[in-house]
Amino acid sequence: MRLFKKRNTISERHVKANKRAEDLVPSGLMKRCPNCGLEFFARRLDKYKTCPDCDYGFRLTARERLAWLCEESEEWFKDIQPSDPLHFPNYEAKVAAGKKKTGLNEAVWTGLAKIGGQETALAIMDPFFIMGSLGQMTGEKLTRLIEAATEKRLPVVVFTASGGARMQEGIYSLMQMAKVVNAINRHKAAGLLYLVVLTDPTTGGVTASFASEGDITLAEAHAMVAFAGRRVIEQTIHEQLPKDAQRAETVLKHGFIDRIVLRQEEKETLAWLLKYGGMQDD
């Protein structure tokens, strides 16, 4: 019967977009949530930059996070610059681009801060500086911060956001994993508090070292928390991973983190932990 005959249809991939009309749409007008896929006007994002539907936290620069997290802050070790021990091709250009994007000299902001009135040593990794990668001087800044906190008997709060060890620095980058963890162990041995907040993404050598050492470990909603990348794992085991396998919610179920906290609640939560963690005077 003609009623049931196949009809000719035009597939979506054969429909040509009106390039002229596309050019009339201002750049940055719309945002798309990488977690739930919601498309919305960029003006709906406030200072926290979270998806209005699923609370996924869009990536922030260290200074953007610092602006709403702390009422006071003082940057330490800001003059430390990345090294280029291997003279890696185009590395200097990547460093220059990272500095321009973030206003930092390295992939982590370090300093003294007050969060909800509680004084703490603070480190915030910046995913816009060579993907927040852990380089030789990133590790140096973190180590110096933790050692200073131990000497001054301060707690330490670290926000992680990293693609892992910085490949352009080879073994010098990998050595920072042990170096920072050793500083953390000395800090803990002194009876001081070490808090970690995992943000999107926390992967590779950072996950395998100081991101996993928190006395209390928090994570932002839907943050990617992993060691190896999805494609690497799937090509190794020849199986597809579940969609949420490397998300904070799955990691929480398996006991790796203690709590998922919404970005709007981070300041209050950290202030409470710092106050009642036994490391602060009233």
Curated annotation (Swiss-Prot):
Cofactor(s) in the UniProt record: Zn(2+)
Disulfide cysteine pairs (residue numbers): none
Pathway where this protein functions: Lipid metabolism; malonyl-CoA biosynthesis; malonyl-CoA from acetyl-CoA: step 1/1
Free-text cofactor note: Binds 1 zinc ion per subunit.
Keyword Endoplasmic reticulum recorded: no
Molecular-function GO term, any one: carboxyl- or carbamoyltransferase activity
Reactions listed under catalytic activity: N(6)-carboxybiotinyl-L-lysyl-[protein] + acetyl-CoA = N(6)-biotinyl-L-lysyl-[protein] + malonyl-CoA
Domain CoA carboxyltransferase N-terminal: residue ranges: 29-282
Subcellular location: Cytoplasm
UniProt zinc finger (C4-type) residues: 33-54
One Gene Ontology biological process: fatty acid biosynthetic process
Gene3D superfamilies xref list: 2-enoyl-CoA Hydratase, Chain A, domain 1
Record's GO cellular component terms: acetyl-CoA carboxylase complex
Keywords: ATP-binding, Cytoplasm, Fatty acid biosynthesis, Fatty acid metabolism, Lipid biosynthesis, Lipid metabolism, Metal-binding, Nucleotide-binding, Transferase, Zinc, Zinc-finger
Assigned protein family: Belongs to the AccD/PCCB family.
Record note on quaternary structure: Acetyl-CoA carboxylase is a heterohexamer composed of biotin carboxyl carrier protein (AccB), biotin carboxylase (AccC) and two subunits each of ACCase subunit alpha (AccA) and ACCase subunit beta (AccD).
Chain's role: Component of the acetyl coenzyme A carboxylase (ACC) complex. Biotin carboxylase (BC) catalyzes the carboxylation of biotin on its carrier protein (BCCP) and then the CO(2) group is transferred by the transcarboxylase to acetyl-CoA to form malonyl-CoA.
UniProt protein name: Acetyl-coenzyme A carboxylase carboxyl transferase subunit beta
Organism in which the protein naturally occurs: Lactobacillus delbrueckii subsp. bulgaricus (strain ATCC 11842 / DSM 20081 / BCRC 10696 / JCM 1002 / NBRC 13953 / NCIMB 11778 / NCTC 12712 / WDCM 00102 / Lb 14)
